[in-house]
């Protein structure tokens, strides 16, 4: 029997397909099962237009058979089958797709749903098999043919016997190597797990004879093994069902079954979209962040399916980083089953779907914030930081998308509020959105810098995440209202500032002396316009705040980053009389006062004192 050569550029092209397109050997089973599903689809479609062909869904299935002794794995379908010409054209030509041709011929007709669109999937069998045999009989013929190949050297076709239409693919599994354990593909557990992973939602039963145990009839204390014909796939994807047919319990069970999380999701988003690009999405907002969410080990992405067949387990291109917490999947008939990860990055249809997913997630979160505030607060406590990182990253390019989703603790409401809610409550004479940054709400509440803002009846937002101020610097303003830190040199209170300047000028020599004593640690010493009951505090001049300095100093090579600090003195506090007296009569004591007040201000800000021993000695000395 003559060996025929592949019509394509045999070895080089076949090697390219096996080694480049498919880097993961286990997907060979996904490819062959998808081809089998296509064959049954074709038979169904033919039955609609050809009265000679009957289609009873119960008679159509895919069977997997593993023979460990002979090291063969067989995939059988009861589909349309192939003629000799079909075998020649579809299997003899690498990258020729019978499914693609069939779809092209019938593209004007509705209901044609063929998974495979490139003829490379079948050849993935050679990743795990030395010898591949295809036995097929077409529904249009009484004759059957056997196609056999050992790889790049070519193939043979000959007549054979087969009682019923359909196709049987027999793989002679390779011998194990040091790097690869090929015989695992003959293991029942492995086959079961691969079918569950990749082909669970193929719409025809995938059957396999599986080993079971049961009590013996004559002795129920002993067990015996028996074989059972088991269907391994669930067949109907939940995301393709009508939402009206499903309960939240169905979604929750699916979420847990897929191991998306260990507790029920906070929000479920189920969409069926038809149009230029058709797709189904089933997305979940987790109730809490995974343990590794804020680490480099966390991998974002949605499961990606083509007609119920998994293409990729984690498709990161479907989610922007700021929505990386979303779990779930996308299924589209418009995506090729055999597209590589590299090509997906440039796929227009995928980009379109990703854009729509982003818009949908934002819309659902906004709705949740408005109509289900309790759960939105839970969500924000888990993932709000990620949204803030989204505002800060990429030079603020995503701020318009995310600003309405942000929440911060309010000094007046004593709970998390949105920026829109804050602005809606602003007083008529209020120019800025005021905020204060610190380690916790409790510590911020006690900050002396907040006194004057609170006295004017203005609401203050509390920033307790490291990223908060960085994000706000990118946001700059919200609804034309600029953000202003309560620690900023200029709070925008003109009358108070005028009085402060007058006090500073009257005590210029005193403040200049204190600044000199502090030897470059502060940019300025001045009379405070913001302090009411407290004696001293620090404010900052410029864009870098004291809290931002603390954050940056925790990063490598940022030890020299410093905010421009201003030491503010409450000239109405009784301690100021002691300072003025010391300036007049005891400059050495004033030096201790200056150092002491500066260190007190550092402690208020949560900053370390440079010389704790000297600080303690100064306190003791002044107590004499």
From Swiss-Prot:
Its main location: cytoplasm. Residues 342-550 are annotated as: B. Keywords: ATP-binding, Chaperone, Cytoplasm, Nucleotide-binding, Stress response. One of its GO terms (molecular function) is ATP hydrolysis activity. SMART domains: HATPase_c (SM00387). Residues 551-624 are annotated as: C. One of its GO terms (cellular component) is cytoplasm. The keyword Transferase does not apply. Residues 1-341 are annotated as: A. Signal peptide: none annotated. InterPro entries: HATPase_C_sf, Heat_shock_protein_90_CS, HSP90_C, Hsp90_fam, Hsp90_N, Ribosomal_Su5_D2-typ_SF. Molecular chaperone. Has ATPase activity. Belongs to the heat shock protein 90 family. Homodimer. This is Chaperone protein HtpG. It comes from Clostridium acetobutylicum (strain ATCC 824 / DSM 792 / JCM 1419 / IAM 19013 / LMG 5710 / NBRC 13948 / NRRL B-527 / VKM B-1787 / 2291 / W).
């Amino acid at each position: 029997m003559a060996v025929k050569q592949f019509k394509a550029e045999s070895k080089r092209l076949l090697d390219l397909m096996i080694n480049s397109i498919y880097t993961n050997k286990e997907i060979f089973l996904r490819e062959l099962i998808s081809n089998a599903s296509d064959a049954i689809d074709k038979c169904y479609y033919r039955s609609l237009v050809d009265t000679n062909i009957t289609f009873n869904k119960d008679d159509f299935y895919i069977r997997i058979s593993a023979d460990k002794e002979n090291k063969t794995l067989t995939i059988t379908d009861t589909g349309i089958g192939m003629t000799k010409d079909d075998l020649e054209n579809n299997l003899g030509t690498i990258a020729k797709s019978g499914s693609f041709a069939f779809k092209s011929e019938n593209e004007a007709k509705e209901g044609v749903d063929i998974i495979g669109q490139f003829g490379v999937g079948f050849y993935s069998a050679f990743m795990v098999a030395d010898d591949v045999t295809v036995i097929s009989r077409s529904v249009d013929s009484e004759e059957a043919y056997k196609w056999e190949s050992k790889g790049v050297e070519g193939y043979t076709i000959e007549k054979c016997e087969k009682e019923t239409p359909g196709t049987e693919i027999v793989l002679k599994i390779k011998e194990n190597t040091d790097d690869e354990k090929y015989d695992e593909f003959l293991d029942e557990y492995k086959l079961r797990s691969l079918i569950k992973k990749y082909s669970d939602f193929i719409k025809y039963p995938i059957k396999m004879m599986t080993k079971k145990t049961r009590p013996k009839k004559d002795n129920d204390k002993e067990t015996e093994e028996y074989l059972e014909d088991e269907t391994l796939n669930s067949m109907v994807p939940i995301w393709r069902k009508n939402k009206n047919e499903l309960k939240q319990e169905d979604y929750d069970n699916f979420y847990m079954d897929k191991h998306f999380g260990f507790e029920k999701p906070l929000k479920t988003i189920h969409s069926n979209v038809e149009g230029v690009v058709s797709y189904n999405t089933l997305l979940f907002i987790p109730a809490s962040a995974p343990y590794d969410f804020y680490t480099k080990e966390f991998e974002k992405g949605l499961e990606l399916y083509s007609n119920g067949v998994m293409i990729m387990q984690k498709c990161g291109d479907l989610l922007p980083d700021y929505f990386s917490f979303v779990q779930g999947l996308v299924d589209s008939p418009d995506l090729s089953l055999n597209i590589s990860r590299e090509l997906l990055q440039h796929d227009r249809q995928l980009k379109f779907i990703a854009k729509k997913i982003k818009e949908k997630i934002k819309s659902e979160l906004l709705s949740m914030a408005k109509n289900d505030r309790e759960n939105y607060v839970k969500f924000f406590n888990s993932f709000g930081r990620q949204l803030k990182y989204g505002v800060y990253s990429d030079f603020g390019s995503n701020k318009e998308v995310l600003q309405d989703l942000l929440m911060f603790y309010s000094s007046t409401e004593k709970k998390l509020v949105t920026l829109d809610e804050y602005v809606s409550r602003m007083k008529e004479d209020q120019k800025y959105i005021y905020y204060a940054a610190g380690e916790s709400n409790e510590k911020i509440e006690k900050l002396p810098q907040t006194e004057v803002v609170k006295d004017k009846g203005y609401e203050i937002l509390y920033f307790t995440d490291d990223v908060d101020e960085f994000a706000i610097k990118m946001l700059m303003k919200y609804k034309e209202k600029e953000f202003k830190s309560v620690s900023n040199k200029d709070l925008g209170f003109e009358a108070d500032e005028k009085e402060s300047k007058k006090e500073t000028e009257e005590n210029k020599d005193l403040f200049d002396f204190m600044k000199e004593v502090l030897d470059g640690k502060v940019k300025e010493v001045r009379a405070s316009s913001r302090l009411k009951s407290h004696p001293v505090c620090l404010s900052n001049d410029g864009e870098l705040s004291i809290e931002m300095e603390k954050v940056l100093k925790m990063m490598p090579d940022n030890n020299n980053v410093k905010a421009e600090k201003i030491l503010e003195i409450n000239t109405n506090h009784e301690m100021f009389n002691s300072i003025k007296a010391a300036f007049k009569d005891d400059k050495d004591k004033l030096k201790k006062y200056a150092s002491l007040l500066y260190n007190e201000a550092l402690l208020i800000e949560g900053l370390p004192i440079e010389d704790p021993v000297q600080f303690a000695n100064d306190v003791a000395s002044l107590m004499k």
